[in-house]
């Protein structure tokens, strides 16, 4: 695992992520400020120090995939996409939940905002899909690049997911556990 030490810049950026999230919900007049504020440290740390991604090529095959299972916490991801240079602006954050033409709807929508890997909303959907993404990645690597040394294939990307207890409760734990031990997920 990569060694990590938080810097003063990281601390300031995390505080800014919290303020931007709370402000966007306040401007919208509705939404969920608690999750984006509490998830700001982990989301910032993942996006800035661990997740392999390229804002100039959001569909790069070798990128890691990040799924925010609890779609109601979408500001968590929007703020990180803004910080990372995916083309979101402060005005986009101010227009959170701003209607049909917003780039920052109440739940992440695949195809609408660059950097969003999938639409999430119902609890458990993102968590279960992340497991599907991991199976797909493993299958794709085995099919298209089985001889490459570990870590050297574009198909060696990671699947990152943030989920809560509601997501886990919504998915059959026993079913997932059976597959997890078979596939080393």
Annotate the PLM regions.
Residues 166-172:
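Short acidic, Gly/Ser-rich segments with clustered Asp/Glu that frequently serve as metal-coordination loops
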Residues 1-160:
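Thiamine diphosphate
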Residues 174-181:
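Conserved small/polar residues in nucleotide/adenosyl-binding loops
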Residues 77, 172-173:
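Residues at alpha-helix caps and immediate loop-helix transition turns in enzyme cores, especially N-
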Residues 117, 169, 180:
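Acidic-residue sensor for enzyme active/binding pockets
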Residues 184:
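Cationic, low-complexity basic patches in intrinsically disordered or flexible, solvent-exposed regions
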């Amino acid at each position: 695992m990569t060694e990590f030490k938080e810097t003063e810049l990281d601390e300031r950026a995390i505080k800014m992520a919290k303020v931007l999230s709370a402000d966007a919900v306040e401007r919208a007049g509705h939404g969920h400020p608690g999750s984006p504020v509490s998830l700001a440290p982990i989301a910032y740390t993942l996006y800035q120090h661990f997740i392999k991604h390229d804002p100039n090529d959001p569909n790069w095959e070798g990128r890691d995939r990040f799924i925010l299972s609890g779609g109601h916490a979408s500001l968590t991801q929007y703020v990180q996409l803004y910080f990372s240079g995916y083309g979101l602006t402060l005005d986009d954050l101010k227009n959170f939940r701003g209607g049909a033409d917003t780039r920052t709807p109440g739940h992440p929508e695949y195809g609408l905002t660059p950097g969003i890997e999938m639409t999430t909303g119902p609890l458990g959907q993102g968590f279960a899909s992340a497991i599907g993404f991991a199976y797909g990645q493993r299958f794709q690597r085995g099919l298209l690049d089985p001889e490459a040394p570990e870590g050297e294939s574009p198909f060696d990307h990671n699947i990152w997911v943030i989920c809560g207890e509601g997501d886990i409760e919504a998915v059959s734990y026993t079913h997932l556990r059976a597959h997890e031990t078979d596939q080393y997920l």
